[in-house]
Structures are given as C-alpha cells and as structure tokens.
Regions:
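Glycine-rich, aromatic-bearing surface loops/beta-hairpins
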Residues: 140, 145, 153-182
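Short, glycine-rich nucleotide/cofactor-binding loops
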Residues: 30-41, 69-70, 115-119
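Glycine-rich loop at the start of a catalytic domain that most often binds anionic cofactors/ligands
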Residues: 69-79
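A glycine-rich helix N-cap at a beta->alpha junction
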Residues: 77-116, 120
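Ligand-binding beta-strand-loop-alpha-helix segment within the catalytic cores
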Residues: 117-143, 157-160
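Histidine-anchored nucleotide/phosphate-binding helix
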Residues: 41-54, 59
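Long, leucine- and charge-enriched amphipathic alpha-helices
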Residues: 1-24
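Short internal beta-strands
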Residues: 57-63, 139-142
Length: 182
C-alpha cells in the first residue's frame, strides 16, 4: 500500500515539525486555496491524519477552494450577474472538482475516483465526514465568499463550519506547530 506509506511518512514529518517548535500547540493550521480534487484529497488525508494523532486541526478555505464547500442541493437567490456567473463557472461542491493534472476532459477524474474505490480509499465526501467526526474545524474565508458571491446558506452541512477572515486564520496559525498551504 504505497499510498498508505506515503501518508504515514507525511504524518510522521508533521509530528516531527510540531515537536520542533517548543511552546507551539500540537495544532495544524492549513490553508486550502486550490479548487483541484487531488489537492482537496491531500488536504483531507493530512487533516484527518493529524486529528487522529490527537492534534487540533483548523482548515481555512479560501478563493478557489471555497467552491468545494458548496452544497449542490442548496440554491440561494438575490445574486447579481457577476455572482451568478461565478456560481455557474465554478464547481458546485466537492464532487464536481477536477484533477489538477491529467484531467483529460473528466476521464482522469473518473479514473482516480474508480481507483480509490477499488483500493478501498475513502472518497472525498467520506473524508469530510471523518474530519467532522474527528473535530477538524473548517473556516471559510469571508472575503473569498464575498468576492465570488457565495452565501453561507449554500455551503455544506458540516459540524462547526464557520466564516472568518485572514486575521482569524493568522491568529490561529500563529499558535500552531504546523502550518500548510495547499
């Protein structure tokens, strides 16, 4: 299981990084900027791995990453033309995200999802469910939501999902032993 070994190596590296900063909390603060499927998968593997190791985990979704948090079943009115255009052009939820490389008009995305299923790797939706169960906190960037015309009411149901700004993230990251940008 090469993927499992890679994840274990990544988690061991995070643990070493956390222990190298005395005074910092056993905490991971992560920015998810990308809207790509593979990067969302990586962020959830790292977040759930760190939470399973007993670390506090906060994930700050900003810019293109915020689209993955949209709930495809929720519709919100009252948007202007630009906001409607962003809504139409960006993925409506995590299941609509695409690979950053080798997407091949969606064939690559379908293949990676099939391989994950065949190898009993949790889907992105299952990873989000696990993250919620493990207490991973998710904060959505308020400015990104405003720029793209997203409303909190159209976001996924996730325990403790909140909105915050860059100051919220920086205060959180300042006390964290590990910070990542994906």
């Amino acid at each position: 299981m090469k993927m499992a070994l890679d994840v274990e190596k990544e988690i061991a590296g995070l643990k070493a990084q956390a222990e190298a900063r005395p005074g910092a909390k056993r905490k991971l603060s992560m920015v998810v900027f990308s809207g790509d499927l593979d990067k969302h998968i990586a962020s959830m593997i790292i977040a759930t791995g760190a939470a399973a190791m007993g670390m506090e985990v906060v994930v700050f979704y900003t810019f293109w990453g915020t689209a993955a948090l949209r709930d495809p079943s929720k519709r919100v009115g009252g948007k202007n033309l630009v906001e409607k255009m962003f809504g139409m052009m960006l993925p409506r939820g995590r299941d609509m995200t695409k690979l950053s490389k080798m997407n091949m008009a969606g064939a690559g995305t379908a293949m990676i999802k099939a391989v994950m299923k065949k190898k009993n790797v949790a889907s992105l939706g299952e990873m989000f469910d696990l993250a919620g169960q493990l207490g991973v906190k998710i904060i959505i960037c308020e400015m990104s939501m405003d720029l793209m015309g997203f409303k909190f009411e159209e976001m996924i149901d996730y325990p403790g999902l909140s909105i915050g700004g860059v100051a919220t993230f920086l205060a959180d990251a300042g006390e964290s032993a590990v910070q990542l940008f994906i």
